[in-house]
Amino acid sequence: MARVKRAVNAHKKRRVILERAEGYRGQRSRLYRKAKEQVTHSLVYAYRDRRQKKGDFRRLWIQRINAASRANGLTYNRFIQGLGLAGVEVDRRILAELAVNEPATFTALVETAKKALPADTSAPKADAAA
């Protein structure tokens, strides 16, 4: 049986790791062991953050919708409740896009939500103060 020399495979393996570590600071881009650790961590971070990004964007959309709906006299949760009662099925990404780029359209949606909402029974009555 022929003898198997592994130098080619070993060099390729190391080269791939060091290529992936290009741009890292200090030893992490030059020394194989440090580069391997950092590349492994980088892949873990990338995997985790691909999932985390979805929640981050949802939170951003909710903040934008809340700010725009408050500017139109309605809180975020009442706005979403009103849209549901009105039968408007627009997701938060589109609502945030409308809030930023189409304020007139967003205002129309807020008015639609206001009309669909029931009267607020927990609010103090105007004649009770008099």
UniProtKB/Swiss-Prot annotation:
Against PANTHER family, the record matches this protein to: 39S RIBOSOMAL PROTEIN L20
Gene name, Swiss-Prot/TrEMBL: rplT
- Coiled coil in keyword set: no
Could you tell me the keywords of this UniProt record?
A: Ribonucleoprotein, Ribosomal protein, RNA-binding, rRNA-binding
Keyword rRNA-binding among UniProt keywords: yes
Q: What does this protein do?
A: Binds directly to 23S ribosomal RNA and is necessary for the in vitro assembly process of the 50S ribosomal subunit. It is not involved in the protein synthesizing functions of that subunit.
Q: Any idea what this protein is called? A: Large ribosomal subunit protein bL20
Family of this protein: Belongs to the bacterial ribosomal protein bL20 family.
Give the GO cellular component terms, alphabetically: ribonucleoprotein complex; ribosome
CDD domains named in the record: Ribosomal_L20
Q: Which InterPro entries match?
A: Ribosomal_bL20, RIBOSOMAL_L20_CS, Ribosomal_protein_bL20_C
Molecular functions (GO terms): rRNA binding; structural constituent of ribosome
Enumerate the Gene Ontology biological process terms. Answer: ribosomal large subunit assembly; translation
